[in-house]
Amino acid sequence: MNSWDAGLAGLLVGTMGVSLLSNALVLLCLLHSADIRRQAPALFTLNLTCGNLLCTVVNMPLTLAGVVAQRQPAGDRLCRLAAFLDTFLAANSMLSMAALSIDRWVAVVFPLSYRAKMRLRDAALMVAYTWLHALTFPAAALALSWLGFHQLYASCTLCSRRPDERLRFAVFTGAFHALSFLLSFVVLCCTYLKVLKVARFHCKRIDVITMQTLVLLVDLHPSVRERCLEEQKRRRQRATKKISTFIGTFLVCFAPYVITRLVELFSTVPIGSHWGVLSKCLAYSKAASDPFVYSLLRHQYRKSCKEILNRLLHRRSIHSSGLTGDSHSQNILPVSE
């Protein structure tokens, strides 16, 4: 194993560690907070988090073993199962992000009727469709024997070793990425751009009111006026940064892998194995970044994390004080009469 392979193996280990801890923390927050569970987005987050954890404990270790051993890391049956999960979880992750963007669009564009339009039952139906959509392609690939170990990505994933099936497999792979990656990307762009448009409209209204107030308050201290103007600027940039993060992480993580898969099918130029594994690692890194992008940086999840931490510290302090009291009572000698 050369330095490139060692670096890729280290990247995979780091991604696995961050993904496991962060997604487990999201699950703890969902279990702890009833307020979060009552909201419709909690179902999308739960679906995304469970998929990320499954990918972390099944697919990432097999890819790590493939990088280290430079060969198929498991038997054919286990590899086909891992390839089925890899295809399903990738599509499920993309479609779950599209569902979350639709939820944000409904919340921002229809704030007064959001609870009526996006109930837990509606969210459950969307998750059910996501699963059905994501299961279609790996089920078809399993029936056509297009699941196995792919040396270029050191992973158990979609692959076809028969030259006579090259065209059919290329059409299938193109359709899979069009109806998972491209469809989700279009939904993300349409919904978040609409959200950005509404957010900018509200910012302009707030800015007009703020400027009118500043004009009326002639005796206002210059430092207060400057802070108000700086807050205006931050308000304009906040929505843009969030939406850029949502779409940017989706593209950075998934686009290199999808493009590599398509170039591999339709180009005669050989692709380096290190780039293939790196693009797969980038796709895996979405499982590590999702908890921070969609959950842990939000106020409700931060509050839930603090409550969990305080409860653990409180239990530890009670336990330690109990042990101290027991040891102190044991050290006291009985006084004879």
Curated annotation (Swiss-Prot):
The keyword Disulfide bond applies. It is a multi-pass membrane protein. The keyword Translocase does not apply. It comes from the Eukaryota. Keywords: Cell membrane, Disulfide bond, G-protein coupled receptor, Membrane, Receptor, Transducer, Transmembrane, Transmembrane helix. It holds the Pfam family 7tm_1. One of its GO terms (biological process) is adenylate cyclase-activating G protein-coupled receptor signaling pathway. Residues 1-10, 69-81, 145-168, 267-276 are extracellular. Residues 32-47, 103-123, 190-245, 298-337 are cytoplasmic. One of its GO terms (cellular component) is plasma membrane. It is found in: Cell membrane. SUPFAM superfamilies: Family A G protein-coupled receptor-like (SSF81321). The chain crosses the membrane at residues 11-31, 48-68, 82-102, 124-144, 169-189, 246-266, 277-297. One of its GO terms (molecular function) is G protein-coupled receptor activity. Orphan receptor. Displays a significant level of constitutive activity. Its effect is mediated by G(s)-alpha protein that stimulate adenylate cyclase, resulting in an elevation of intracellular cAMP. PANTHER family: G-PROTEIN COUPLED RECEPTOR, G-PROTEIN COUPLED RECEPTOR 26. This is G-protein coupled receptor 26. The gene is GPR26.
